[in-house]
Amino acid sequence: MKEEKTMLKIITLGDSNVGKTSLFYHYVNGEYRYNRPPSIGPDYFIKELKVENKHVFLMVWDTCGQERFQAFSPPYFRGANCYTLCFDIHNEESFINLGKWMDEIIKYCYGNIPFVLVGTKSDIPRTDKSISKARIEQWCKNIEDQGIIDKVHYFETSAKLSQNVTELYNVAAKLALEHYSIVKYISIIRPIGPPEEVKVGTCC
């Protein structure tokens, strides 16, 4: 019997210029792209891989500059199985704005929301103005204490040096598959009612 292949949707969020598209490009093409023009409009790629001995199609969405215009809508979030939430470890504003991005996720989603926290540009040496690891750990703890997610997975990455790029997407894919399996199970055992009455831990 031919193995069924599952489509998993991962959405990348974060402020402009934190390096989301560089990570996106590196994961797809295996290289860092210098002098890349500014991204405009959403884009996505589909990559086939094996997760937990299961063949899946990973659909990863990149906002590509849309965040500058707050041009998001429920359809963009619909069906997401995991998020990668990005900030620049040298940019205070991008770190503070993680709260805004979490609000967007919670606004459109229900239940325990799987996501991976991603600190970018780790190839640049930290300074006194960089976000300390202690602050990042505290942010993760606060999210866990609020019950938004059981455990925050955090990676410091560099698309330029190929640091943790594949690793973060491997974890995101695993979390997405776990979420997909839970939602699929609930949809089987629970009658499907009106959209506003069904809260199964996915975006609607």
Curated annotation (Swiss-Prot):
As annotated in the record, motif Effector region runs over: 36-44
Residues lipid-modified (S-geranylgeranyl cysteine): 203-204
The record's InterPro entries line, in alphabetical order, gives: P-loop_NTPase, Small_GTP-bd, Small_GTPase
GO:BP terms for this protein?
A: hypotonic response; phagosome-lysosome fusion
Where does it reside? Cell membrane
One annotated GO molecular function is: GTP binding
Q: Which UniProt keywords apply?
A: Cell membrane, GTP-binding, Lipoprotein, Membrane, Nucleotide-binding, Prenylation
Q: How does it sit in the membrane?
A: Lipid-anchor
Q: Name one GO cellular component term.
A: phagocytic vesicle
Per UniProt, GTP binds at: 14-21, 62-66, 120-123
Q: What is its main location?
A: membrane
Give one Pfam family, short name only: Ras
Q: Which NCBIfam families does the record match to this protein?
A: small_GTP
Q: Which family does it belong to?
A: Belongs to the small GTPase superfamily. Rab family.
The name of this protein is Ras-related protein RabL
Recorded source organism is Dictyostelium discoideum
The organism that produces this protein has a lineage beginning with: Eukaryota, Amoebozoa, Evosea, Eumycetozoa, Dictyostelia
